[in-house]
Each structure stands twice: as C-alpha cells, then as structure tokens.
Amino acid sequence: KISYTDQGKGTAVVLLHGFLENQSMWKAFIPELVKKHRIITIDLLGHGATECLGYVHTMEDQADMVHHVLHELKIRKAVLIGHSMGGYVALAFAELYPDNVKGIVLQNSTSRADSDERKANRDRAIVAVKQNYSAFIRMSIANLFSEDNRERLADIIEEVKLEALKTPLQGIVAALEGMKIRKDREVILHFAPYPIQLILGKKDPVLNYDDNLEQIEGTQVQLTTFEDGHMSHFENQAELLVVLSGFLKRV
C-alpha cells in the first residue's frame, strides 16, 4: 500500500520527505505551489501511511516505488524535490530513470555516500531506537533544528515529533539500513542534463556545511544557503518557498 496525493495542473513536481517524516511536512507549501504545478506528495516506504517492504529499504527501492506512482499517474517527466533522505531517493531515481527527470532540488541533502563515521552513527541509531523508541525519536527530531531555533519553534518541533512517532519501528530501521549503504551519486551533479538546486543550512547539525560545498565545485548546480539548521521547511519556510517557486519557473 502506497500513500500519495496528486493535485493541480502543469509541470509534475514530486515532493519527497525525509527520514522520520511523511508527506505532511510539505503542507505549508502545497497551497502556493499547486497554483501553477501538478504537485505529487508520496509517503516513502515504511513512513507515513505507506507500508514496509522489508527490513532494508534501499534508496533504489524507494526510487522504484516513486517510479511506480508516476507510472500509475501516467507522468513521464517530473521535477523531484527531496528533503534529506528524500534527496537521496531523488538521486537514486535520477540514476535509474534519467529520462523521467526534469530537474532536482536537494534540500538539506547530499549526493555523497555515508562516511564511516556516519555509518557508525546509523548503527548506533538502530540500537537506540530498538531500546527506547520514543526517546530516540524525540531526541532525533530536536537535534535536526539549529540550536537558536529550538525555543522559537518549540510548538512546531512538538508537532514534528508527533508525526515522527507515527513511523513504525520496522520502517525506521529499514530506512537507517538503506541510507547506510547508499551509493555516492556526486557524478549526477556533474553530468545531469537538467537543472539541479542544492539548499543547505549553515548551522545544519546533521550535514556539515563546508564539507557539502565541495560536491558542487565545477558543476552547474545552483546553491542556496540559509543561516539555520536541517529543517529549512520550518526554519526558513518563507525563503524556501521563494527558492522552490523560482526553481520551478526556470525548469
């Protein structure tokens, strides 16, 4: 069972949420974007109302599922906008189905594979979530926001935690296992025939800003930098909407 929404007319735009999120993360953006575009939101495998497929959800598995939805909807080409893990899925999709891509936005995401340190962190997370599911989720979500915003956005953070707590344990572990073994896809940033936009947060606690700049050196990728954390869709909502609308105008 795959949960998705499809509304509006125009260029097809697929919104892909991140780890511990679901399609509700886009709700502030849809009313504006749907005025000029056909907006598809999808719950990724083991997240939201989409069921688990197995015990490891690779980025390719997720991409195949997205392709299946687009095929159902008879959509040949789409712009993919992915937050964090959603960006990894967008790049896996671009590798598997290059002819179906019209443009990509990587929001608080990276084309690079996990470092050894990140892989070890994923393994620790798998142990932690099995030991104490709710404490793991509450801590993980708070840590995605820049420290300066944790008080200002306390209500939103609480809401995000409640959405995250809907994610089944199997889905969480399968996503962590899948992200841990994902391929490096930096080559796509160098050779893609369509526009790509990278959106980074200066104070992203999860993705080091300076390390992430390196991947776009010598590419045509457009960079937008926000001053905040990993959750631009909440921390920099108005500015992000402007960036996304501008990108969609250009494709």
Q: What kind of region is each of these model predictions?
A:
Residues 3-55, 59, 69:
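Conserved HGGG/HGGXW glycine-rich cap/lid loop of the alpha/beta-hydrolase fold
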Residues 1-13, 34-37, 71, 75-76, ...:
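Alpha/beta-hydrolase fold catalytic core
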Residues 76-115:
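Conserved hydrolase catalytic core segment
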